[in-house]
From Swiss-Prot:
Cited function: Catalyzes the conversion of glucosamine-6-phosphate to glucosamine-1-phosphate.
Organism: Methanococcoides burtonii (strain DSM 6242 / NBRC 107633 / OCM 468 / ACE-M)
Cited PROSITE patterns: PGM_PMM
Free-text comment on the cofactor: Binds 1 Mg(2+) ion per subunit.
InterPro entries reported in the protein's UniProt record: A-D-PHexomutase_a/b/a-I, A-D-PHexomutase_a/b/a-I/II/III, A-D-PHexomutase_a/b/a-II, A-D-PHexomutase_a/b/a-III, A-D-PHexomutase_C, A-D-PHexomutase_C_sf, A-D-PHexomutase_CS, Alpha-D-phosphohexomutase_SF
Protein name: Probable phosphoglucosamine mutase
Similarity annotation: Belongs to the phosphohexose mutase family.
């Protein structure tokens, strides 16, 4: 049994993630936890899965506090007062998906060993429902958003800039515009009404999905556009010219803003060489893709900052959870005295290509075997996550997605990155034929 991917349990509603599964997760979690805080993003299936997992927790004798519709970082921050946190979300995935992500009191997602413990309990159905008079209590707390907001405002400086915030009809709508206004920003909202159908755009805040935000930034003369995903753990930006800032650029800018020389920065294997060169004297450590793996390494080596080019930024001084609301506030600090386009120009840039090839989950293992046999002849191989081949002029990474039926390709080189990408793409397509 393999329930947990790189970002918790996630799948299509009522097919891969069901109320029966959620009930069992609650029963398994309740075996060792006496208190849990539970939140959800706006997804249509959110309340259904929430009720099921709460039923399991209560049946195991665990007390539950519901905090309603909140962002994932809000839930993670609230977990400090409980034994664990449960977030019902599928993050950036489309509306038909739903998921469950579990959190520790320090804001760290459940690690591999904790996930395996839950999986083993479910597989063996080794549950321990309590007697009728020991069933857990359920209550509600409306203060989680306020507490998260106050924490952010205590850790950022004021800003007078004009910002357009596109929450993608996600959970960030409940907090981000308010935080930015309290900072002193002039805030214009876009797609900032929670709607689990995500009618305005795909929840993932990538370049393709942010066309309206780019137009709005230029039309309203904004200093910046900020976009979040369905649960606001991810955040990306548009500069004042309406240009998308890539994840590698964002990570490099945050590192420069937050860190001193000699800093330790943790990134996944698909991160650009730009980050290594953006902060001279720093140490860049690469991990498996997935914010939980980045967070684990940040904690292990006491790193200064970390993140993923997909839009997850981790500031360990405040939490080990990627926080798209805190990152939104931090980037306003960053552009207070200089434009985002000016800061972007100062970064070293290398041609980078990213893409995906559709691949059914059951065929991924075969495809990766073929990729390994072909690419091992091309350079030094690392298999920390997928297959990364380093060459004199650059590198290419082939990695199966942990949440979707896709294989991801990343290629970067000082020259010829497109050829590296095409080579890997062709190998995958040949293996699928």
């Amino acid at each position: 049994m393999k329930l947990f991917g790189s970002s918790g349990i996630r799948g299509i509603t009522n097919k891969e993630v069901t109320t029966d599964l959620a009930l069992k997760v609650g029963l398994a979690l309740g075996k060792t936890k006496r208190s849990a805080v539970v939140g959800r993003d706006p997804r249509i299936a959110g309340e259904m899965i929430e009720h099921a997992i709460i039923s399991g927790l209560l049946s195991a004798g665990c007390d539950v506090v519901r905090i309603g519709m909140v962002s994932t970082p809000t839930l993670a921050y609230a977990t400090k007062d409980y034994d664990c946190g449960v977030m019902i979300t599928a993050s950036h995935n489309p509306a038909e998906y739903v998921g469950i992500k579990l959190w520790n009191p320090d804001g760290m997602a459940f690690d591999s060993s904790q996930q395996e413990e839950i999986e083993e309990c479910i597989e063996k159905e080794d549950f321990e429902p309590v007697n009728w008079d020991q069933i857990g209590n359920v209550s509600e707390d409306a203060n989680a958003i306020r507490q998260h907001t106050n924490m952010i405002l205590q850790n950022v400086k004021r800003s007078s800039k004009r910002v357009i915030i596109d929450c993608g009809c996600g959970a960030g709508s409940t907090i981000t515009p308010y935080v930015l206004r309290k900072m002193g920003c002039e805030v214009i909202t876009l797609n900032s009404q929670p709607d689990g159908y995500f009618p305005a755009r795909n929840p993932e805040p990538n370049d393709t999905n942010l066309t309206l935000l780019k137009i709005a930034v230029k039309e309203f003369g904004a200093d910046i556009g900020i976009a979040q995903d369905g649960d606001a753990d991810r955040m990306m930006a548009i500069d004042e010219k309406g240009e998308f800032i890539t994840g590698d650029e964002m990570l490099a800018l945050f590192a420069r803003h937050e860190c001193d020389e000699g800093a330790i920065i943790v990134v996944p294997v698909d991160t650009s060489m730009m980050v290594d060169d953006a902060l001279p004297g720093s140490t860049v450590i690469r991990t498996r893709v997935g914010d939980v793996y980045v967070a684990e390494e940040i904690k292990r080596c006491n790193a200064d900052i970390g993140g993923e080019p997909s839009g997850s930024w981790i500031f360990p001084k405040i939490s080990y959870c990627p926080d798209g609301i805190f990152a939104s506030a931090k980037i306003m600090e960053l552009i207070e005295n200089r434009t985002l386009s000016e800061l972007k120009k100062e970064l070293p840039h290398y041609p980078t290509y990213r893409g995906t090839v559709k691949c059914d989950n059951e065929r991924k293992a075969h495809v990766m075997e073929v990729v390994h046999s072909k690419l091992e002849k091309c350079g030094k191989i690392s298999d920390i996550d997928g297959i990364r081949v380093e060459m004199d002029n650059g590198w290419v990474l082939v990695r199966p997605s942990g949440t979707e039926p896709k294989i991801r390709i990343t290629a970067e080189a000082r020259e010829g990155a497109d050829r590296l990408f095409s080579m890997a793409e062709n190998i995958i397509k040949e293996a699928l034929n």
